[in-house]
């Protein structure tokens, strides 16, 4: 019983810390990190989180984090809710954007980094907290259950910063930008 109480204590401590701002993008508020046991609503989760949750008011444009092809649209009310899955096949990775009010793209469509692909919302298992769930998969994984970390990886190390139309991004690896617009001048120094 002691290990369970100790683990619950850690979860409650983490929950009390609240949201964090992304160091490289002061506009981006991370509500729940990869593998976190605290949800976007700051309550304990039953399973580790398979992505990152970013605060976004309902109706905020969600941007493609990298060039890709829409591999599927998701409608999974017990998990992702309305979502978009982008394939980045040159890197054998997929990015998943969940809890949208609606998508602006269709399967098979080519998208460019920074292109609006949908609007943020509270669909699916969002705990009624408006946010965007960003997930990176090594296999198409949008329909898996959150907490199943197989085939997922932490998106944060792949983030190159805020989207800037005039910036060149690495082409030898998957470099993502935040899926939410940053204020002008808020772009980061992490290149």
Predicted regions and their residues:
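Bacterial N-terminal signal peptides
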Residues: 7-16
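Short histidine-centered loop motifs in beta-beta connectors
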Residues: 63, 73, 90-114, 140
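Active-site loop architecture of trypsin-fold serine endopeptidases
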Residues: 120-133, 141-145
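Positively charged n-region of N-terminal signal peptides that target proteins for export
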Residues: 1-6
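Surface-exposed, glycine-biased beta-strand/turn segments
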Residues: 19-82, 91, 113, 122, ...
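Short peripheral tails and domain-boundary helices/loops at the edges of structured domains
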Residues: 98-99, 137-165
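Histidine-centered catalytic micro-motifs
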Residues: 96-98, 129-136
